[in-house]
Amino acid sequence: VKVTVLLEELLAAGHAGAEYDAWLINIGSGDQFGSGFVGANPNSKIPALVDRSGPVPQRVFESGAILLYLAEKFGAFLPTDPAKRAEALSWLFWQMGSAPYLGGGFGHFYAYAPFKIEYCVDRFAMEVKRQMDVLDRNLADREYMAGDEYSIADISIWPWYGALAMGLIYEAGEFLDVASYKNVQRWTKQIAARPAAQRGRMVNRVMGDPATCLPERHDAGDFETRTLEKLVAAGEWPKAG
């Protein structure tokens, strides 16, 4: 989601060179272990990017690296002032280090583990609430994560923590008391209202409201003609094989 949100934001800002193809990688079928994908990401994890705009294709893997690469390539969504840039990068890398505790830690033990282990749930819940408090305090006196400028810091944090703040993942909103983080709630809704963020969130989704799922994106027109709803109606989904 982070990468497609940034790509859609770049296109919306007039950077035509950010036009992209988003292929669906079926991790349930093991697509990520195929030689084609491993060539893009030797760690066999999504996302991965291959930039073919230059004389030699450039691979970039890990979402933080991709966001930074694109922001620098297009000179957008990353402050140029050294102090503001450092603040934005600090929050970008905060997300890289913090999100595993949310997804792989709390999310796993609270929602997916075959049986509940109270200590694990409580330990990771405490950490996630601490993280939400960090975000909430930071947003108390600034519009965006790094100040008054929307940046890749926001784009990196919003998909995970924004979804958590709105109670959209793990059915844990009440358990974590997410409604109490008022500043995160305000920030989440502000970004969710951005058309580019809405489009980016649709890309490569195959679960949820079919009208807001776009399994693959190869052209801007796909948002109107190739949603999951349209593919199912046309008998083109699920794909053969």
Regions found by a protein language model. Name each.
Residues 91-195, 241:
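GST-like fold's C-terminal all-alpha helical module
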Residues 26, 152, 204-205:
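Short, solvent-exposed turn/loop segments enriched in Gly/Ser/Thr/Pro and often Arg
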Residues 1-122, 126-129, 143, 229-241:
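GST-like domain detector, emphasizing the conserved glutathione-binding G-site
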Residues 204-241:
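Acidic/histidine-enriched, glycine/proline-rich intrinsically disordered or flexible terminal extensions
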Residues 85, 181-184, 225:
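Alpha-helix initiation and N-capping motif
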